[in-house]
Each structure stands twice: as C-alpha cells, then as structure tokens.
Amino acid sequence: MLRTIRLTTAIVCFTLITLLFLDFTGTLHTWFGWLAKIQFLPALLALNIGVVLFLIVLTFLFGRIYCSVICPLGVFQDIVSWVSGKQKKNRFRYSPAMKWLRYSVLGVFIIMMVAGLNSLAILLAPYSAYGRIASNLFAPVWQWGNNLLAYFAERMDSYAFYEVDIWIKSLSTMLIAIVTLVVLFILAWRNGRTYCNTICPVGTVLGIISKYAIFKPIIDTSKCNNCGLCARNCKASCINPKAHEIDYSRCVTCMDCIGKCKHGAITYTRWKPKNETATNEDTKAKSVTTEQVDNARRSFLSASAIFATTSVLKAQEKKVDGGLATIEDKKIPQRENPIYPPGALSARNFTQHCTACQLCVSVCPNQVLRPSDNLLTLMQPEMSYERGYCRPECTKCSEVCPAGAIHLTSLAEKSAIQIGHAVWIKENCVPLTDGMECGNCARHCPTGAIQMVASNPEKTDSPKIPVVNVEKCIGCGACENLCPSRPFSAIYVTGHQMHRII
C-alpha cells in the first residue's frame, strides 16, 4: 500500500512538473506553479524559509521522501530504471557508500555558490538539470506534436490549436542538456540512483538528515532468511543483507524492498535504538557506538551550519542590491550589458539566485528570454529582441520563477521599471541609408520615449530620425524588434546593472 501511494504521488508530481516546462501557454502555472517553488535549491535561494523548513521536517519524519516523490530528476531516473528492470530483474547489489566523493562534491558546490560561480554549481542541481532537459529536448517534441494537430485542425475548420515557433534558444545549453540526459540515462539504466547518492548535493544534505528520520524501513532479523532479495531490488544499493543493515543516508524511501520481501521482514515503522529492540535470538545486532553517533552529529551540524551561512549571505546580498528592408533574420547586437527581466532587481541579484532551470524561458510567450552563452552566466536566461519584445501586459516570467531571481511584479510596477535603454545607430537607420520614411520605433514605443525629429534642423523636409529620451525608456525592446533594418537593427537596447524605477 505504501509503495502504491508513493508511486502514484510521484507520477502525478512528475507529470505536472514536466507539463510546466512543456506548457507554452503558461496556463498550468496558475494551478500547479507551486510544484516548482517547493524544490529544495530554488526555495533555499529564494529564502523561502517555510518551504525549506517543511522539506527538512518532512525528511526528518519520513526520510528522503523529497527524492522519491517531489524531485523530478529522481522520478525520471526511477522511470529509466523501471524500464531497464523489465529486461533484467533483481540486478542491483549492495555497494559501500562513497562518502569522500559525496561530501567533496557538496563542499565544492557550496563554495561555488558562495563565490558566485552559479553557472558551474547549477550543473549539479537536480531540479535545474531536469528543467534544462525538459525545456531543450522534450519541449520541441511537444511543440512539434502541437503544430501537427494545428495543421490537421485547421483543415477541419477548427482553431483549437495554433502553431508555435520551434527554435534552438541556445546551442550550448542544448548540448549540456543532451550530455546530462545521456549520463543520467546510463547511470539510471545500469545502477538506479547512483547520481542521487554520489553526486547530487541536495541528496547528500537530505541524506544527512534522513539518518535521524523517525520513520524508516526496518529489517526484522528474526524473520529475515538472508535471501538478499531486498538488496537485489534496492535502486539505491543501500541494503547490506549480510549485516541486516540499511544505509539511511542513501535510502530514498521508495518502499520497493518492502514490497519484494516475501517474509515480511522489512516494515516501514518508527525507528528505535537497537538496545530497545534486541532479543536473545538476535545475537548479530550491533549497537551504535558513541563515536559513530558523534561523527554523524558533527556531519549534520556542519552541513546545517554551512547551508545556514549560505542563506544568510544570500539574504545580505539581497538587501544591499537593492517592410522597408530585405527580409532576413536579425543578428544579436553587441550589448554593453546583458538585459534581465523586470523583477530581477539587478544583474547581481539575478545571477546569484537563478538556477537556470529554464522555466521562465519555457513560458515566455514573446520568445524574448533565452539561455546565455557567456561562461560566467552560462545557461542563465537573458533578454534579446530578435524574435519579439517584452510586452507591457505580460508578467509570466516573474510569476513562475521559483528561486527569487525574478520577483513577482504587477503590470503597473513593470511599466515603471527601467531594465535598460535604447541606443540609436545612425549608420543602420533606414531614413538615412535608403532615404525612406520610417518611424517604426517611435510609433510602437509604449512609453513615448522616442520622438522623430528632422535630421537637419535647417531643413524641415529632411528625413526624420529617432531621438531617445533615456529617462523615459524602460528597455522593453519594441523599437529594436520592430526596426526594419537588417541584419542589425538601427536601434537596440543595452541593459542596466541596477534596475531603476522611473
């Protein structure tokens, strides 16, 4: 029963989280966006103390339920492992924990996060890794299927579906997603939860807490006949059948061992110290030494202190920061500074909180957000206006961000946030290069920051050119996107390091 409940809940959570990345309309986020906000690392970076405490208490009570139910990457590995198990059953075996590797990776991860090297650290973040896979690899297939339905529906005079553009947002991010998928697939196919118990920093932290979980799978040595069936079905490879022991730091509470044991020797129940449960027949049971307990406590307290310090540092940073031309694709201009969405507050706040999960990229209806190719901000979204511009009536990216990189922003607030300003390039402007009237940028500026004036003040009939009022420009990119000049726009937006209210 427990295994069935766990499987059902995990499948529902996994399906809904995956759909959040596939849903290009953003409709599902109204009801299920909270599933992204209860992921451990995004909640920690967002200083969402309520969620972090909830996950810690959940782990302390029931073990690593988060890893087996809530984390989409963990459930994805379970699916791969389940398919693999159809061909070869009882293929797992116990293996000793590689503590040196687990804690080394965790230490490096925390150091990189504190040092601001998020673009490297987030390569290991489980939720973000799955988000990149879903956004870059699964979403194009989903969109292709949608376009196929739209094609046939249109011929039946139905407009229930509409076509969407399928495009590569970032080649480097897609390649990283492919490599991540291949590595995880191989590990899960061969060894189940190897990644979760050797590399994943979230799994290591929750593993330290789960050692002290109140409810755990317990082996009743009086019923166990040493058949080893539980160990051969343990995807975490954490059951030592010879010693009748379970490594609770690696156990993901999947309940598979309980369902496989034919003698009822494993039950999920309240843990008791061995000296309370030992019987005369159970001569093989070993009491936990004071030294082991002290070491475990030190590990737990050390990890807790490091993570608490990280949270405080992030909090302090947050306070301080406070058709006239040939039709061809536009090229990205060389911007002085990258552009970050309204609600990001500043470049510093955005880059230090963003986990590059690509959720905002997936829901952006105007195709403005795309992953960065810059090494220091690799995979973190930034704005570019070749395919669209940031419309004043859209705040979807701020609604879905789970990590606090983009703060929730109302429509009124967004219209007053200056994320950058427009820069005019005289050499590319159509009225001067082709001698034709234009004014596209001025007509579509939502704030009236662009005015058309005579290029020669002494001649009223001279071609009119745009003049940008930097104080009124909010950097939405309408001018850049709608400029007919090719391949580079005659006007482009450069970002501000610190966003301003105008």
What kind of feature is each model-predicted range?
Residues 1-244, 249-250, 256-502:
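Non-ligating segments of multi-cofactor redox enzymes
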